[in-house]
Amino acid sequence: MIIYKNVDYGIYAYQIGFFKVKRIGEIVWSDHYDSKNEKFSLRIEGFYVAEERRRHGLGRKLLNKTIKQNLNENYPYMIVYPKTFGEKILKDNETLYRIYEHLGFYFTEEMVDRTKADNEMRYDFIVKKKRRKFLYRTNFFSYL
């Protein structure tokens, strides 16, 4: 199995398959501008793993590959496309919510208007800063 990257019109994708013959998994993402926070984030447009290949960690592998590539871009978080999580879809497909929750996403709800709520699943990028160890070296010229 190989993971290969596909870029088309600002939409990026990682696909996992057998030598580009049979696709068994895919994650598709794009840039998203959040006007409230005035920051760019990643937005997952699609996430797919073939039914016979589920429960083997392929979804986690695709998500980790996406996160590793985009950590250097200073995105604060990643969201799942909000239209996916409308009230009707969440009631009908509880497993979709559980899958994203298992991968580390959490459900947020913000009020856009008094009558309309904006639902999304969010994954925060938490980068642990490594402590730098400074090596104290003796000056070479002090021995001369």
Regions found by a protein language model. Name each.
Residues 130-133, 137-139:
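Positively charged N-terminal leader segments that act as targeting/secretion signals
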Residues 49, 55-69:
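Conserved acetyl-CoA-binding loop-helix of GNAT-fold acetyltransferases
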Residues 63, 93-99, 112-119:
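Short glycine/proline-centered loop/turn elements that form peptide/ligand docking sites
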Residues 70-92:
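Conserved GNAT acetyl-CoA-binding A-motif
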Residues 38-51:
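Conserved acetyl-CoA binding element of GNAT-fold acetyltransferases
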Residues 84-109:
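Conserved active-site alpha-helix within GNAT-family acetyltransferase domains
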Residues 2-27:
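Conserved beta-hairpin
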Residues 29-30, 49:
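GNAT/GCN5-related N-acetyltransferase fold signature
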